[in-house]
Amino acid sequence: MISLKSIVDKLYNLEDLSYQESYQLFDYFIKGQIELPLQTSILIALKLKKETSIEIAAAVEALFDNTKEFPKIKGDLAGIVGTGGDGFNTINISTTAAIVAATAGYKVAKHGGRSVSSKSGSFDLLESFGVNIELAPDQTKQCLELYNLGFLFAPFYSDGFRHIKEARTILKTRTIFNILGPLINPARPNKVVIGVYSKDLILPMAKTLVNLGIDRAVVVYGSGLDEVAIHDDTYVAEIQNNQIIEYKVSPVDFGIYTYAIKDLEGGLPEQNREIIKQILLGKGKEAHNAAVAVNVAMLMRLYDKDDLKQNTQEVLEIIKSGKCFNTLQQVINYSNK
């Protein structure tokens, strides 16, 4: 076993960790074997050094090895998630996109937690709607099979996250746990859209996904946002057959108008709940509908639907039908049975 001191000394010298060192470090973290002051300094050292794809992949495996198992789902399973920490406090776009994608017929396992650095995390929102976020894994699997949608609350599957919650709250900044969150979905989706908070993270995240054997994925950075943007360019790394292709898309590629970031500002969970409810009922603002649609359109690429304009139009029609709220309502009802 590698000593914590030797790992910490390397980090304080801003040296990269080996796979084994990173695995051991995150095993210590998730088992609550690191004191709070040291936790914060380790997280800051990693942030200053910049995390490597090897460190991230090792951390993912350490966290998976300490996670409650989720029963395997047959066929394709999608994940759509952002790292958070983009600082703009937008409405919960990836959560809404997951509900819309499920309504469109794609099985989506949405993994996440409560807010750390924003006003409203994905599961703050879901709780405000009345979703039982601590549904047993076998029930969540059945919910996925019935309604194409399942919600997996991170602390429920890995109670070790309670050991690092205080450090993350104290730091009030993005840490490696923002990066790890999207990668440790216990349902192990084989098709994922991951939004990152920095352009510098696109390639390390994509390389990590290749290392983890993910079938198809896109990593996106939306000019300040951790999702596909409707205000400016979105930088993309797409993974197929273990190859990474980098490109850039803009709102015009989706056939939509360009909006401002402020058009997507959210608020407290209750305010976000009302905004999201209106979108799902087919009564949302154009900017809100567009933001959700482009993210689902990007997910559809992973199912060999390459025409982003056509994808976006199909999704907008589904949103405007109001059917998406029925999907959420069915999941709420099922989760509280």
Swiss-Prot record:
Q: Cross-referenced Pfam families, in alphabetical order?
A: Glycos_trans_3N, Glycos_transf_3
GO molecular function terms here?
Answer: anthranilate phosphoribosyltransferase activity; magnesium ion binding
Q: Does the keyword Transferase apply?
A: yes
Would you kindly state one Gene Ontology biological process term found in this protein's UniProt entry? L-tryptophan biosynthetic process
Q: What class of enzyme is it?
A: transferase
Functional note:
Catalyzes the transfer of the phosphoribosyl group of 5-phosphorylribose-1-pyrophosphate (PRPP) to anthranilate to yield N-(5'-phosphoribosyl)-anthranilate (PRA).
Please give the name of this protein.
Answer: Anthranilate phosphoribosyltransferase
Organism encoding this protein: Francisella tularensis subsp. holarctica (strain OSU18)
